[in-house]
A protein has these predicted regions:
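Short acidic loop-to-helix transition motifs that present clustered carboxylates
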Residues: 44, 111, 213-220
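Buried hydrophobic positions in well-ordered alpha/beta secondary-structure cores of metabolic enzymes
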Residues: 11-14, 67, 131, 168, ...
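Buried hydrophobic packing segments
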Residues: 21, 25, 198, 290-301, ...
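Glycine-rich phosphate/pyrophosphate-binding loop and the adjoining helix
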Residues: 135, 139-181, 185-187, 205, ...
Length: 345
């Protein structure tokens, strides 16, 4: 039976990079027989422009019924500070689908090491994953703004913490078997709970080493010794900051994918970069983050590990051959980059 994939096209460069990702998927499917169907939908600013909410009911329904969801990019300067913004649609989708676990792999391509702001010896061997809790904590707590006072409620349950830490251990089992749990337990009650739960979950994974780091120390280590990390797991706010810090290690956002997983429903796959409205429509956007997000989808949602590796190898060999878009020092267009990757599948 054909797998159902919802493609949320989004704003800015979203349509261009989504098309690139789907072209790679189509080329791969022709070689491997992967059977799927695509349900393309606008999302974010495009929905608001049509005088609708940023997450229409029909889009939510289609997403719930899908086997996987691809999202290109959302956001537009015209909505900065507006009461209704594209980002609200994404937050609502995460909450409605219970996309509690954000997975962001951080790996430096050998051919792109020169882009990193760190010295080559600092980034040698960097290959880790940030696992961020995505639907709880301060982002989804009560926000109270008074004239001369404000409060944001930071709230976690045992169950919310347990499931994200367990997810990190499951990922680590197939890697170097090291989990670094990041908190602020010397100050925050939620972090004291976090550390307690981490210790308890670790008992179920005797083959995996658990380490603890305070968030300020972890932020420094990510710059001074990033290769020490294997799997990082942390709460929503800390994960938001640290995952963005980790993206700087590669020197470009254009080659980094991400996934957001639920417990039972479909997962969502997206690049980590924004909608780049300044270059939208010019055909120069880097499609690699989107293409690698497709690879993550094939691996995580459909168990097609070799297909995912074929895409990753095609990306790596294309970069090594010097085929680079402008953001990473070359002149290749979106189409040329995509065609180079397809040719190497």
């Amino acid at each position: 039976m054909a797998k159902k994939i919802v493609a949320l096209v989004g704003d800015g460069i979203g349509p261009e990079i989504m098309e690139a990702g789907l072209e790679v998927l189509e080329a791969l499917a022709e070689k491997t027989g992967f059977d799927y169907e695509i349900d393309r939908r606008p999302f974010g600013g495009a929905d608001i422009d049509a005088a609708g909410p940023p997450l229409p009911d029909e889009t939510l329904k289609a997403s719930r019924e899908a086997d996987a969801i691809l999202l290109a990019a959302i956001g537009s300067p015209q909505y900065d500070g507006a009461a209704v913004r594209p980002e609200q649609g994404l937050m609502a989708l995460r909450k409605e689908l219970n996309l509690y676990a954000n997975i962001r792999p951080v790996k430096i391509f050998d051919s792109l090491k020169y882009l990193s702001p760190l010295k080559p010896e600092r980034i040698s061997g960097v290959d880790f994953v940030v696992v961020r809790e995505l639907t709880g904590e301060i982002y989804f707590g009560d926000h109270i703004l008074e004239e001369r006072k404000a409060r944001d409620i930071n709230d976690y349950s045992y169950e919310e913490v347990e499931r994200i830490i367990r997810k990190a251990f499951e990922i680590a089992r197939n890697r170097r078997k090291i989990v670094t749990s990041i908190d602020k337990q010397n100050v925050l009650a939620t972090s004291k709970l976090w550390r307690k739960v981490a210790e308890e979950v670790a008992q179920d994974f005797p083959d995996v080493t658990l380490e603890h780091q305070l968030v300020d120390s972890a932020a420094m280590l990510m710059i001074t010794n990033p290769a020490k990390f294997d799997v990082i797991v942390t709460e929503n706010l800390f994960g938001d900051i640290l995952s963005d810090e980790s993206s700087v290690l590669s020197g470009t956002l254009g080659v980094m994918p991400s996934a957001s997983h639920s417990e039972n429903g479909p997962s969502l796959y997206e690049p980590i970069h924004g909608s780049a409205p300044d270059i939208a429509g010019q055909g120069i956007a880097n499609p690699i983050s989107m293409i690698l997000s497709v690879a993550m989808m094939l691996r995580d949602s459909f168990g097609r590990y070799e297909d995912a590796e074929r895409i990753k190898r095609a990306v790596e060999t294309s970069l090594a051959a010097g085929i680079l878009t402008r953001d990473i020092g070359g002149q290749a267009s979106t189409k040329e980059m995509t065609e180079a990757i397809i040719a190497r599948l």
